[in-house]
Design a protein with these regions (language model features):
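Membrane-embedded transmembrane alpha-helical bundles that form the catalytic cores
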Residues: 1-478
């Protein structure tokens, strides 16, 4: 991952210095940010990725002005539909490519083998563009009834092409989010930004947390769980449980570690990002889980799929249908295999079940024990659903479940029993870590500035000593 490369460190350091030398010159600062966004996409991606994004930005710019210039809702809906079609084409081209080529050959047409790469960050800047188009459309509705040129010339949500390009290419969020709403971003882009020394300790903490989560925790857990998931028939039932539980931990550390890093990079430039995680494995039910996991995606699903379908205003059973549709679409967005659809549908069905129990007045009750049992049940369900997320092929997921059933009678060794017990203890103590980041920030405040480089240097040396060879890419960068 290029965030951990020496090249990125050098380039970002030079950009950081130049960026803050321009403080007070907002237009120059924003221009430099735009240049850096595209330079990163080009240098660490490809010219192809940068060109696709540039063309996409031009389309969104034209579409936003078309939306602002007319009272017809169809223009807004058509623009969003084209964004979704563009995303679907690139994301699912590989799925229908072979069938399409075979169909052409059936009719005697010779076609060259064509491969189209999924542009880096396409999903996240597509979602961001939808929030922008909707903001323009909603602002136009507010201005309805004004003079005919009001909408075109004074729509408060319309942005210049350079500003829109900065938003869609913003390097901290382009790879794997968080999905930043346009209003949230542009309010910061239009404000004069100053370096605030009080943020330094938070930035350091976020960087350290991100590095530890990704480089140490996620990578070491992956080294343990990946062989188990790759060859489930070779392991007993407890080891298989440890493998899939390990994947749950790996995915969280990997993704939340990424978010910590990009939040630090954004804060270094004077921007704050929306929260994306809030101790998700503390959740007592699936609704609580989705209020804590990938928050920017779950709120996007709520506001741009679930509520437009009808939300909770169409009666109980239609509401449950909308929940199921929304989460199934979320699964399809993650990937083009049946497994991702199953993963999304499982979460949708789980929420329907939860809502049905609540409608009947049933539940585990209150109290510490009931809360802990609810946490365990939620974590186990989420982990079971991850089984269809981590395997691309449905047969592999079924093979894992089959191996688990076949190997139940195999003897369990002391090693895996101790690991399972330790994992249970860590899970039980997990809520105690809710204020860990805040505590680290406060601790850094207590360290004299003259000693702080020595302390941080020692911490980084320890991380360097214990870090494994090779750092895998962030998992969500593939979506």
């Amino acid at each position: 991952m290029f965030f951990f490369s020496i090249e990125f460190g050098i380039i970002f350091a030079l950009f950081f210095i130049a960026y803050w030398l321009l403080r007070g010159f907002l237009r120059l600062q924003n221009s430099l940010l735009l240049l850096f966004n595209y330079a990163i996409l080009w240098y660490f991606g490809s010219l192809y990725f940068a060109l696709v994004l540039a063309l996409f930005t031009l389309f969104i710019f034209a579409a936003s002005h078309a939306i602002a210039a007319t009272d017809r809702k169809s223009v807004f809906l058509a623009s969003v539909a084209l964004v979704v079609c563009n995303l679907s084409f690139f994301k699912y081209f590989a799925s229908f490519k072979d069938g399409f080529e075979n169909l052409l050959r059936f009719f005697g047409l010779d076609v060259a083998d064509i491969d189209i790469l999924l542009p880096l960050g396409l999903s996240f800047y597509s979602f961001a563009s939808i929030t922008y188009l909707r903001a323009v459309y909603e602002a136009k509705r507010v201005g309805k009834g004004a003079p005919s040129d009001y909408v075109l010339l004074q729509n408060p949500k319309l942005e210049s092409l350079p500003n829109l390009a900065i938003y869609l290419s913003f390097f901290p969020t382009i790879i794997a989010g968080p999905i930043m709403r346009s209003d949230f971003f542009f309010a910061q882009l239009h404000s004069v930004r100053f370096w605030r020394a009080k943020f330094a300790n938070l930035i350091i903490t976020l960087l350290l947390f991100g590095i530890v989560k990704k480089v140490l925790l996620a990578t070491y857990v992956q080294e343990y769980s990946e062989p188990i998931l790759r060859n489930p028939l070779n392991y007993n039932a407890i080891e298989l449980l440890l493998g899939i539980f390990g994947y749950s931990v790996q995915l969280y550390c990997d993704f939340s570690g990424y978010v910590d890093l990009v939040c630090a990079f954004a804060l270094m430039l004077g921007f704050t990002l929306p929260p994306n995680f809030n101790m998700p494995y503390m959740a007592r039910n699936l609704k609580d889980f989705w209020a804590r996991w990938h928050i920017s995606l779950s709120t996007f699903i709520r506001d741009y799929i679930y509520i437009p379908l009808g939300g909770s205003k169409r009666g109980f059973w239609l509401t449950q249908l909308f929940v199921l549709i929304a989460f199934s679409l979320s699964g399809i967005w993650h990937g083009n295999t049946i497994n991702f659809l199953i993963w999304g549908a499982l979460h949708g069905l789980g929420l329907v079940w939860l809502n049905s129990l609540r409608a009947l007045g049933l539940g585990l009750g209150s109290g510490a024990l009931a809360g802990f049992v609810a946490r365990v049940c939620t974590f186990c369900f989420v982990t079971f659903a991850w089984l269809f997320f981590c395997y691309k092929d449905f047969g592999d997921s079924v093979g894992f479940l089959g191996a688990f059933g076949e190997n139940l009678a195999q003897p369990v060794g002391l090693r895996e029993s101790v690991i399972l017990l330790c994992g249970f203890v860590v899970f039980s103590c997990y809520p105690l870590l809710r204020n860990l980041q805040r505590m680290c920030v406060l601790y850094l405040y207590k360290i004299p500035n003259i000693l702080k480089p020595l302390v941080l240097g020692a911490i980084l040396c320890v991380i360097f000593v214990f870090m494994p060879d090779g750092i895998p890419n962030f998992i969500y960068a593939g979506f």
